[in-house]
């Protein structure tokens, strides 16, 4: 199977020559790297050998269903979560501003917009700031692979809206400019959107509110009636546990995950998914002619990118339908949920973990829907440690969102939430060796090549490459975090930066300070060297026991290991999985079953 990936292009860009940027973080250092050069690195796989047929390149689609099977799974899920009895009682026009919630199912903001209006106008703003440079080191904020995944999510969202009587209005520009303008044209009384938690997203919310306050809507009645502008209603909808239901204020959130988990498991219940009306239409009947119609979803070329082909690793299909198809495939067709806890630390293939994280990050998949499907599976098939562990991972995902609210911008700072003072290197040459998979340690190099080729890496791999960068190389952890921001399909600021602070020993939990031994990890999780040989074809001809320890048969090791080759990581067997969110250094022993 041939998969499509994207690399940078010299074609004319969809964006202005000077991209606007956010200013809510401390002043950055000058960019270390050229933006276009890095975009090409993100998605330019090196040539692959084909010597060993068993390790020959193969691309796995996720979900691995046919198009008809995906649609059937999606239709079945929507059928169970739609209600013909829902009634709307509102008037006028409401705008539904889609952000990181690119789905119809269990989208409270969308249902509330529908109920409070006679017609809903769905809007997505292609914000150029999200395609600029990262704050400290000037990497691309959105790499080519995630840009393509986003395009697919938007295309799928548009199709699903059209099936239910609506469409998707797509505009390029800042939401604080676009939404007030559209609200004025359509006389929209309210803009509904999902609430976010991190600084850049919160800044946009403030700017949108300020812009809407400048809009004067036409009023009936007497001439001295007070003018009213459109309201902004932000709805919580990104976590499994609702923020209003957790037994702490964000200010008093525990800094130890286990304390948080035990409290929510014992004191909180998870709300049910919001039912969806059978029809969401009609759209507004006037105003579209004044704004040149619905607009179009940008192509990769318009984003300054082009596509190329690769035949290795995993290829994710974006969109809500694909997400629902993946749940159907993993839980019900392949029956893999029952063994998830035993397989979650794998590194090869599509099915060692759920692979839900890219859809969760884009909001194409509701965590509450996953919860409901786990409970349904437990009733119909089996309830065991594996079914619990998927929920355990979703609680971690929730925790990082709430932690980002408690600690704010400190999760992006060098010293982290605890303001830990440490000496870090920003050696460009060393970092590039890690980034490009040229460290001389096959397990590190293979993982980094998988990341740049596919936009994905196993949780085990994320733990290992993070530990190596910050512990063995002594490199500023923010360089690693920003490179992950560039590459990952499942990038989410709260989880990404929360986890990197943990890995660097500067996170909110003072007990989180661990080292992962590369030899130990290789022997435990890639004992026959299949993973490294898959991504590093020059190792395929070596005996299996030498693939992770090739000596002079491989490139020179760029740094010595901090604890040599005999150190055993006492935490190696307890790493958490990436299955439900973009993790890399998350961990915790299961304490009690839900």
Which role does the model predict for each range below?
Residues 123-127, 354-358, 369, 389, ...:
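Contiguous, well-ordered alpha-helical segments that form the cores/surfaces of helical PPI scaffolds
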Residues 418-425, 431, 435, 472-474, ...:
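C-terminal, helix-dominated tail/subdomain
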Residues 176-178, 340-346, 352-355, 425-437, ...:
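Active-site-adjacent structural elements in folded domains
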Residues 2, 14, 25, 32-33, ...:
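Glycine/tryptophan-enriched, flexible segments
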Residues 190-193, 456-477:
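Hydrophobic/aromatic-rich, well-ordered segments within soluble, folded domains that form packed cores
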Residues 339, 402, 459-460, 476-481, ...:
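Acidic/polar loop patches that form or flank catalytic/metal-binding clefts of enzymes
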Residues 393-443, 449, 459-463:
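Active-site core of glycosidic bond-cleaving carbohydrate-active enzymes
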Residues 2-280, 449-450, 495-496, 578-594:
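Trp/Phe/Arg-rich N-terminal binding region typifying the photolyase-homology
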């Amino acid at each position: 199977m041939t998969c499509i990936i994207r690399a940078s292009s010299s074609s004319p860009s969809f964006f202005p020559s000077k991209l606007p940027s956010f200013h809510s973080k401390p002043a950055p250092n000058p960019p270390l790297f050229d933006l276009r050069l890095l975009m090409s690195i993100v998605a330019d796989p090196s040539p692959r050998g084909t010597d060993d047929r068993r390790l020959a390149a193969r691309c796995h689609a996720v979900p691995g269903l046919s198009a008809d099977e995906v649609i059937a799974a999606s239709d079945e899920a929507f059928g169970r979560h739609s209600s013909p009895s829902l009634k709307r009682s509102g008037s006028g026009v409401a705008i539904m501003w889609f952000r990181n919630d690119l789905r119809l199912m269990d989208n409270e903001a969308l249902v509330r917009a529908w109920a409070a209006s006679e017609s809903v106008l769905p809007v997505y703003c292609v914000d150029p700031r999200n395609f600029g440079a990262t704050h400290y080191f000037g990497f691309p904020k959105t790499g080519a692979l995630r840009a393509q995944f986003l395009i697919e999510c938007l295309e799928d969202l548009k199709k699903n809206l059209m099936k239910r009587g609506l469409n998707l209005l797509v505009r390029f520009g800042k939401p604080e400019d676009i939404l007030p303008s559209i609200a004025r044209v359509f006389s929209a009384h309210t803009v509904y959107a999902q609430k976010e938690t991190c600084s850049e997203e919160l800044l946009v919310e403030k700017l949108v509110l300020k812009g809407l306050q400048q809009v004067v809507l036409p009023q009936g009645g007497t001439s001295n009636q007070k003018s009213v502008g459109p309201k902004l209603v932000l709805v919580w909808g990104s976590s499994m546990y609702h923020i209003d239901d957790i037994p702490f204020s964000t200010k008093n959130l525990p800094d130890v995950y286990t304390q948080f988990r035990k409290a929510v498991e014992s004191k909180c219940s998870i709300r049910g998914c919001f039912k969806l009306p059978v029809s969401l239409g009609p759209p507004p009947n006037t105003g579209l002619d004044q704004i040149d119609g619905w607009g179009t979803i940008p192509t990769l070329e318009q984003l300054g990118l082009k596509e190329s082909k690769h035949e290795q690793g995993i290829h994710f299909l974006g969109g809500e339908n694909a997400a629902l198809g993946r749940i159907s495939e993993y839980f019900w067709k392949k029956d893999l949920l029952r063994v998830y806890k035993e397989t979650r630390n794998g590194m090869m293939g599509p099915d060692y973990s759920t692979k839900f994280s890219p859809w969760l990050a884009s909001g194409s998949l509701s965590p509450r829907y996953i919860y409901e499907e786990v409970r349904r599976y437990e009733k119909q098939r089996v309830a065991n440690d594996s079914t619990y562990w998927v929920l355990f991972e979703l609680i971690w995902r929730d925790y990082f969102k709430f932690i980002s609210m408690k600690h704010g911008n400190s999760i992006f700072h060098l010293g982290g939430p605890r303001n830990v003072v440490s000496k870090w290197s920003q050696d460009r040459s060393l970092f590039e060796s890690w980034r490009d998979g040229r460290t001389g340690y096959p397990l590190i190099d293979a993982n980094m090549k998988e990341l740049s080729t596919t936009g994905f890496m196993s949780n085990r791999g994320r733990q290992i490459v993070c530990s190596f960068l910050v512990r063995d190389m002594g490199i500023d952890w923010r360089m690693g975090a920003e490179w992950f921001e560039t590459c990952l399909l499942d990038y989410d600021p709260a989880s990404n930066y929360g986890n990197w602070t943990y890995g660097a020993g500067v996170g909110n939990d003072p007990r989180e300070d661990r080292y992962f031994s590369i030899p130990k990890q290789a022997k435990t999780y890639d004992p026959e060297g299949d993973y490294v040989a898959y991504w590093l074809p020059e190792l395929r001809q070596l005996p299996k026991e030498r693939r992770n320890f090739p000596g002079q048969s491989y490139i020179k090791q760029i740094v010595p290991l901090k604890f040599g080759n005999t150190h055993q990581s006492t935490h190696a067997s307890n790493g958490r999985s990436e299955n439900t969110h973009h993790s890399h250094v998350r961990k915790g022993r299961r304490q009690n079953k839900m």
